[in-house]
Amino acid sequence: MRIKILRLMVIFYSFNLLGQEIITLPYDNTGLDYQGPEVKTKGYFTDKHNFQNISIPTIQVFLPKGNLNTKTAMIVCPGGGMRANAIHHEGFDVAKALNERGIAAFVLKYRLVPIHLIGKNEGLDHPYSKEKKQLAYGHLDALNAIAHARANALKYEINPEKIGIMGFSAGGAVTMEATYKSSEKNRPNFIAPIYPWMKIVDNQEPPAYGPPIFIVCTTEDALKLAIPSAKIYTDWAEKNYISELHLYHHGKHGFGMRKTNYPVDNWFDNMVDWIDAIGMLN
């Protein structure tokens, strides 16, 4: 029994050495109608689970090993149509890869559409009213995640002026809305929307401080996100802000960190190289 307890203590200690602390972010659910706790559901095209009915926003902290630390940080916003959180291939797997490149990662579970408001066979149909309403809350969670990382920069051994945010699909919408609505204390220093679902984001001007942007999308994406992604790039480029667009053909929606055996598999390495090129990695 004592040996088992010691083994559990070692596992627990090793887990915490990785920095996987979970922080509850400030929130106000006025105007939202949640019933019951968050729910684990089967993920899309995977045996790993997603989360639904998230009513309490959190970040899970993943810190690189000391000798790898570049003092750069990234808030990671998984996708899921504002109804689910694809926390593995668009969250934890991303955090692990970022840590391997010396980047601290904060995986965000932002608030989602209450599960009882989603019809059993209801798809994502225009005008996306539930999802647009939820974005008003989700982007606040992203801003609070940035503010937390910046306020605790010494604790996490990161540079408060090298905090980025990236997101996939609906997480890309959260990324963009947070950027548009940011203030000095919670604005990202660079952003990376990956196949962002811009159909729920109102057309807005890039913020005046001009955060560098790295965009990835495919024309094969069934959600038709290539043109909106190109528009984001054009909006930034017209103002001479640092902007880079990687538009591939092959790659179905939601690839995240999964391998497709197409050139789009290079997107992550390209993103890290870009972060380095704009002076945010060293």
Specify the residue positions occupied by each region the protein language model found.
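Bacterial Sec-dependent N-terminal signal peptides
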Residues: 1-22
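Short N-terminal segments immediately surrounding and downstream of signal-peptide cleavage
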Residues: 20-34
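Serine-hydrolase catalytic machinery in alpha/beta-hydrolase-like enzymes
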Residues: 33-39, 44-50, 55-60, 70, ...
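Residue-level signal for short, function-critical loop segments
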Residues: 65, 79-80, 169, 219-221
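Structural recognition of the beta-strand scaffold that forms the well-ordered cores
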Residues: 73-77, 105-109, 162-166, 190-194, ...
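Primarily recognizes the serine-hydrolase "nucleophile elbow" in alpha/beta-hydrolase
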Residues: 137-209
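The feature captures the conserved acid-bearing segment of alpha/beta-hydrolase catalytic domains
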Residues: 189-247
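C-terminal catalytic histidine-bearing segment of alpha/beta-hydrolase fold enzymes
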Residues: 239-282
